[in-house]
C-alpha cells in the first residue's frame, strides 16, 4: 500500500496553483425588443458602433444601421424567422468585411461575397476588406487619361470613357442599358481590365442569362458577378454595390485596372428607402431619406484613377439608372447625374425605330473622357456629334419643306449613312482600330454612293477585307494610335480597292 506524503501533496498543489489561469470572456450583449421585415430593434448595446456586425443567438448576423437614445436599429443579413423578441444579441467589434482577390474571378457570389455558383468555396483569397471605405483623397488621384474602350462605336467616338471615370447609363426599361454594360465587359478581353458586374434587385433568370452570355464569350475568366436578386432581402440589395466596389478596389489598390457595373442604382435606392422607412428614419422627397444623395456619392466616389506613387491603378464605374417615361428630372436620376462624370442617355423612341444602341447623342456627354480618347479617334470623330445634331435638325425641317438644295440633300444623305453606321448588334464589340477605319471611310465620303440599306453589309465585309488582306493598316493604327498621312493614304487605297472588288 503506497503512502501519500504530505510534501508531495503540497508540491502538486503549488504547481497547479502556479499554472492556474483566470480567463474571463467579457461580452456586451443586448436583447431584441422588436423584429420583423428584416430589421430588429435591440436594447442594451450602448457602445455599439455604426456599421458594426452583431451576432444573434440563432447564428444570424446583423449590421448596426441606426443609433438611437435608448435602442439600436439593425438590419439582418439573412432571414429573420429564427430571431425572436427577447433573443440575446452580442457585439462582435468588427466592421462588415468581404473576401477580395483574384480567386473571385470567374465566380458568382451573393451580396456578402459568399459563392452561389456551386463551384465550391473560394480559393486564392488575398484578404478580407471592409465594405465601407473612405474614397481616395485628391492627393492620391490622377486625372483620367487612359481610354477604356467599350467596343461600341457611338460611345467610343462621341462619348469616350476613361479609366477611373464614372459614366452613367440612363434610360427607360428595356432600352438596352444592360446590353451596353455587358458589351463593355466583353470588349475588355485581353485589355488587362478586371470586371465586376453587380446585379441589384434583378430577376434570377436575368442574372443566369447574363452569366451564360459572359461564359459563352470567354469573359467570365476576368469577371466576378455579385448577385442580390429581387428575392433576396432588402439588406443584401443595399450592401451588394458596396461589396462589388470593395472587390474592384483590391485591383485598383494593387496597380491593376478594374471596371464595376451597378445594375441598377434605382433598385438600390428602393432597397435603402425600404430599410430607412422600416427603421423610422424621417422621409423626404419621394419618401427617400435625406441622405440618399450621400448613399450614392460615397459609393461612386470610390471609383478613381490613382497616382503613380500608389501604383497607377484605376477603378471605373458604370452605374445604371432606370427612368420612368424618360423623366431624367426625377430625384434619383438628377442625383446620380450630378455625381457622375457624364451620362449615356438611351431613348425609347430611338430604340423602337431600330436605332440600337439607342443613344441620344444630343444630351449624352462625357465630361472627362475626351482626355482619354486616342488621337486617331479624335481625328476622325471630332465633328461627328455636331454632324449628327445638324442632321437631326434638318430631318425635322425636311418634314415641312418641299424643295431642298443639293448641299442640304447631301448633308441629309451623309447623316442617314452615319446613323446607319453607328448601329451595332448586341454582344459584338468592335476593336478601336476598326472603328477608326470605318468612321474615317464614312467621313471621307466613301459611303455616299452606297445605299443606306447596304451600309451594315459594307461595314462587315470591309472589316473582313482589312483582316485578311490589309492587316498592316489595322496594326499601324493600333501601334501609332493616330492617323498619319501614310495610314490615311493606305486606307484611301484600301477602300477604293475594296469597292472595286465588291459591288454595293
Swiss-Prot record:
It is a peripheral membrane protein. One of its GO terms (cellular component) is plasma membrane. ATP binds at residues 171-178. Its main location: membrane. InterPro entries: ATP_synth_asu-like_sf, ATP_synth_asu_C, ATP_synth_asu_C_sf, ATP_synth_F1_a_nt-bd_dom, ATP_synth_F1_asu, ATPase_a/bsu_AS, ATPase_F1/V1/A1_a/bsu_N, ATPase_F1/V1/A1_a/bsu_N_sf. PANTHER family: ATP SYNTHASE SUBUNIT ALPHA, MITOCHONDRIAL. Produces ATP from ADP in the presence of a proton gradient across the membrane. The alpha chain is a regulatory subunit. This is ATP synthase subunit alpha. The lineage of its organism: Bacteria, Pseudomonadati, Aquificota, Aquificia, Aquificales.
